[in-house]
Amino acid sequence: MKRVLSNVLKAWIFTIVAFHNFSTSVTADAPVNAAEYNALCRLYNIARAGEGLKEEDWLPCAGKAACEKTAASIEDVFMKLNFSEPSAVVTTLDGTRVELQNSASTRIKRAKLAKVLAAAETIKAQQLKYHESSKSLLESAKANFTKAIVGGWGNPTTPDESGLPTTFKTNRADDCKLAGGNGGKSLVFDIACLCTTSDSASGSKYTCGPKSGDNGSGWLDNNGDNQGKPAAKEAWKNLRADCRRQSAGVRVTPELISQSLVIFEGLIGTRAASGHDNARYIFGTVATAQSCGHSTATNKGSIDYKASNAQQRGDIEWEKNLRMAEGDLRGLLTAKQLVAALQARAEHLEDAAFTIFNESVLETQIAWESSRPPSTDANTSQKGPLQRPEKSGESSHLPSGSSHGTKAIRSILHVALLM
């Protein structure tokens, strides 16, 4: 409960600070739409970074082999004891060669190891399942990020046209709106709508952030289909590099996506569009005579995010895509946590397997030492096939002596098999 409250508090603090940063970064000389431009560019850069997410950072195993490693180690230990002849020479973990007997005790330990191995194989199968499903989640997230940028129009080889509609409406007012228009379909197009100033070629401008200039043509100055495309294309071509600098180098997380969308949504229907002919808000919502069609160069751009006389923020397509990407990333983080828990159980089983194997080695050593005639000269006494380390831990996974005990070994195995 404390952790949940802490996360909620952190999210609110981040949002408050972010709003403060947005407000303080918009100076008196900045365009009236600077806050909206910064919000869209931030989301655009998050989506761009999301397109490049790497498997090694997001998949629960750093490669399929990592999910299989522990089970393979246990299988190797099992195979050392899996012999049917009267005896077999095995190599211990510290490199010593020992002749193990296929005794009743060895067969019992082999049966225990078989159970440990079966449990490890079950865990491996679960890990691989999460690994494969995570690959699908990652691809889904990256696809959603791309669609947020370019919409359903694809990603043409010409960068200036990437994210712009393949078919424009008859005028800017119809294009730059959510209901029945192209508004809300891609971040690129919404930035172009926000930053172009008028329908007419006479003084048609792009104005956002520190950048402004002549579009060369207006939304209505090209006969035939797609007459708004040149103006939108020119605006995006001139703003693209600046927009990418706004939040360059962002590290994508589900929390960052959510918090940045909160900032964006907080600007809808709240900031007046001063100097507009028809628009009440820069990011419009339900309002009387809200329209983003303009006729003079002094008017600023806007986007009409209303739909059918009802507030429909959830119908912004690129926002839906970012929300889906956020969900994909949360699923990836959950999978990583689950696989980490499974890995801890697998390593516990691995410890149990090593303990069982080392017990067999020690039994062989004790039997060998017991069968030797007593030596009268300590300096000439022969040593057995396996030397006990003088201190615990000097030999990898090898207990320091019989004090490790069958009781302790059974306890470890019992706990491992219950996991």
UniProtKB/Swiss-Prot annotation:
Residues 401-419 form a propeptide. A lipid is attached at residue 400 (GPI-anchor amidated serine). InterPro entries: Trypano_VSG_B_N_dom. It is a lipid-anchor; GPI-anchor. Its main location: membrane. It is found in: Cell membrane. Disulfide bonds: none annotated. Keywords: Cell membrane, Glycoprotein, GPI-anchor, Lipoprotein, Membrane, Signal, Trypanosomiasis. Residues 369-405 are annotated as: Disordered. Residues 395-405 have a biased composition (Low complexity). It comes from the Eukaryota. Glycans are attached at residues 82, 358, 379. It holds the Pfam family VSG_B. The keyword Cell wall biogenesis/degradation does not apply. GO terms for cellular component: plasma membrane; side of membrane. Residues 372-384 have a biased composition (Polar residues). VSG forms a coat on the surface of the parasite. The trypanosome evades the immune response of the host by expressing a series of antigenically distinct VSGs from an estimated 1000 VSG genes. This is Variant surface glycoprotein YnAT 1.1. The lineage of its organism: Eukaryota, Discoba, Euglenozoa, Kinetoplastea, Metakinetoplastina.
